[in-house]
Swiss-Prot record:
The active site is at residue 181. This is 3-methyl-2-oxobutanoate hydroxymethyltransferase. The gene is panB. GO terms for cellular component: cytoplasm. It catalyses: 3-methyl-2-oxobutanoate + (6R)-5,10-methylene-5,6,7,8-tetrahydrofolate + H2O = 2-dehydropantoate + (6S)-5,6,7,8-tetrahydrofolate. HAMAP family: PanB. Mg(2+) binds at residues 45, 84, 114. It comes from Escherichia coli O157:H7.
Length: 264
């Protein structure tokens, strides 16, 4: 199978073809996703909650990410694999580069970091040293204590203008992808249209170039609060492989996320 690359996603954006992505944390699910053609995966620090059982993503370490990245890469050797740099792993550009090197050696193709314009120098340092970067704006879970909980971001003119400015700054610094989480559809549309790089949404409506879901949300195995943007594809299909195919089909057709999964 031909490897999926950042260029593959750039082509999707240019051709206005929506694409699906998903989190993965182990060999078996990564292999299954790849076999069904879901070839863009993220080893997210969400593993702190879904795999380790913590209340937030904050306890996750670089070593945790590297461990799961290695497992996912074994299962999906040709996927485009993103890996989160966890909380306090990129406080300085130098620290970011050292930790990015660890997860890249483990098998990642790209690192994802949360934050806006303050990360410009970090993004430049990484990209100049051959580490591709995916930005992450909106609801950035590592900032949960600043936000006072998991809340929609970017409402109001000032907040939306700031996020657009952040997105443009990250792109100018060299970021090649952007994740937008829990923002109003109208803002997601503005940002997606303003950027040349692909934008992946989660809780950002169906106007972004791609979508991502935490696999546990996609299969309805998340305990406790279920995010508004989540959909249990397994409940409708009764089969994990069929659920993966339905998720991909609904993203590609624009059916998912629907109005009921979106914010304004």
């Amino acid at each position: 199978m031909k490897p999926t690359t950042i260029a593959s996603l750039q082509k999707c954006k240019q051709e206005k073809k929506r694409f699906a992505t998903i989190t993965a944390y182990d060999y078996s699910f990564a292999k299954l996703f790849a076999e069904e053609g879901l070839n863009v995966m993220l080893v997210g620090d969400s593993l702190g909650m879904t795999v380790q059982g913590h209340e937030s993503t904050l306890p996750v370490t670089v070593e945790d990410i590297a461990y799961h990245t290695t497992a996912v890469r074994r299962g999906a050797p040709n996927c485009l694999l993103l890996a989160d740099l966890p909380f306090m792993a990129y406080a300085t550009p130098e620290q970011a580069f050292e930790n990015a090197a660890t997860v890249m050696r483990a098998g990642a193709n790209m690192v994802k970091i949360e934050g806006g314009e303050w990360l410009v120098e970090t993004v430049k340092m990484l990209t100049e040293r051959a580490v591709p970067v995916c930005g992450h704006l909106g609801l950035t879970p590592q900032s949960v204590n600043i936000f006072g909980g998991y809340k929609v971001q970017g409402r109001g003119d000032e907040a939306s203008d700031r996020l657009l400015s952040d997105a443009l700054a990250l792109e100018a610094a060299g970021a090649q992808l952007l994740v937008l989480e829990c923002v109003p559809v109208e803002l997601a549309k503005r940002i997606t249209e303003a950027l040349a790089i692909p934008v992946i949404g989660i809780g950002a409506g169906n106007v972004t170039d791609g979508q991502i879901l935490v696999m546990h949300d996609a299969f309805g195995i998340t305990g406790g609060h279920i995010p508004k943007f989540a959909k249990n594809f397994l409940a409708e299909t009764g089969d994990i492989r069929a659920a993966v195919r339905q998720y991909m089909a609904e993203v590609e057709s624009g059916v998912y996320p629907g109005e009921e999964h979106s914010f304004h």
